[in-house]
């Protein structure tokens, strides 16, 4: 350590040599999360990624608050206060949007920090909800050897004749309806179908699915 409290080049080089292995593992973990942590690929890594994203908000806010409290000068203190306010408002808007989406879908996927778009598929007497990165005009459904995949998500076993007549895509502000259009069976247990968006409005999902698959949304009054 130099006399003025700074770290010399040799000391910095020694620290890097000692911590190279740990730094390598940290970067490898980030690479795995960024490259493989998708909801339709590896659910375990995806959950870890979501936990990291959730923790980044309070940690970032705490860093700016501490930077404002223990400011170097008034300029850095002012910047830290401004950034703390911005991060706080962004975090608050995330919670507002998440609770609005939860009120619409009753799904814990509503608190996903990566996206606020949810696909809702009524299947086998229940509604399967999965996250989407964007809302499309057409959503494809593929059945391969009796297993249904929709928008990249595996939804379990299903025959093409048992596909729901209607699915929805929910955001914090709207609920979009998609109607089953063209469908084609391929072989005995495979096939494909397309759902076309035909209506959008301020609705909430009808989680009571004991009746018909056709009525899966209720108008928000």
Swiss-Prot record:
A single Gene Ontology MF term assigned here is: structural constituent of virion
Q: Where in the cell is it found?
A: Virion membrane; Host Golgi apparatus membrane
Entry annotated with the keyword Membrane: yes
Tell me the residue ranges located in the Intravirion compartment per UniProt. 40-49, 100-221
Give Gene Ontology CC terms. host cell Golgi membrane; membrane; viral envelope; virion membrane
Q: What topology does the record note for this protein and the membrane?
A: Multi-pass membrane protein
Q: Which residues form the signal peptide?
A: none
The cross-references to PROSITE patterns, in alphabetical order and at most eight, read:
COV_M
Query: Which residue intervals are topologically Virion surface?
Result: 1-18, 71-78
Is Glycoprotein tagged as a keyword?
yes
Give the keywords, sorted: Glycoprotein, Host Golgi apparatus, Host membrane, Host-virus interaction, Membrane, Transmembrane, Transmembrane helix, Viral envelope protein, Viral immunoevasion, Viral matrix protein, Virion
| Membrane-spanning residues | 19-39, 50-70, 79-99
> What HAMAP family does the record point to?
BETA_CORONA_M
The miscellaneous remark of the record is: Bat coronavirus rp3 is highly similar to SARS-CoV (SARS-like).
What family name appears in the similarity comment? Belongs to the betacoronaviruses M protein family.
Its biological purpose is as follows: Component of the viral envelope that plays a central role in virus morphogenesis and assembly via its interactions with other viral proteins.
| Assembly, per entry | Homomultimer. Interacts with envelope E protein in the budding compartment of the host cell, which is located between endoplasmic reticulum and the Golgi complex. Forms a complex with HE and S proteins. Interacts with nucleocapsid N protein. This interaction probably participates in RNA packaging into the virus.
User: What is the protein's given name?
Assistant: Membrane protein
């Amino acid at each position: 350590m130099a006399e003025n409290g700074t770290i010399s080049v040799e000391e910095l080089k020694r620290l890097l040599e000692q911590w190279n292995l740990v730094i390598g593992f940290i970067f490898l973990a980030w690479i795995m999360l960024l490259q493989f942590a998708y909801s339709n690929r590896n659910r375990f890594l995806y959950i870890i990624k979501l936990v990291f994203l959730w923790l980044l908000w309070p940690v970032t806010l705490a860093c700016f608050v501490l930077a404002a409290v223990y400011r170097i000068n008034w300029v850095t203190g002012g910047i830290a206060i401004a950034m703390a306010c911005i991060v706080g408002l962004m975090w608050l808007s995330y919670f507002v949007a998440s609770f609005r989406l939860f009120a619409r879908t009753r799904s814990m996927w509503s608190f996903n920090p990566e996206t606020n778009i949810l696909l809702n598929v009524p299947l086998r007497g229940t509604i399967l909800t999965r996250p989407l990165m964007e809302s499309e005009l057409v959503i494809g459904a593929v059945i391969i050897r009796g297993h249904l995949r929709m928008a990249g998500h595996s939804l379990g076993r299903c025959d093409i004749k048992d596909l729901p007549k209607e699915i929805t895509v929910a955001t914090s502000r709207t609920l979009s309806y998609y109607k089953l259009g063209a469908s084609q069976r391929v072989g005995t247990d495979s096939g494909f179908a397309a759902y076309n968006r035909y209506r959008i409005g301020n609705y909430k999902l009808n989680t009571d699915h004991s009746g018909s698959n056709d009525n899966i949304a209720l108008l928000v009054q």
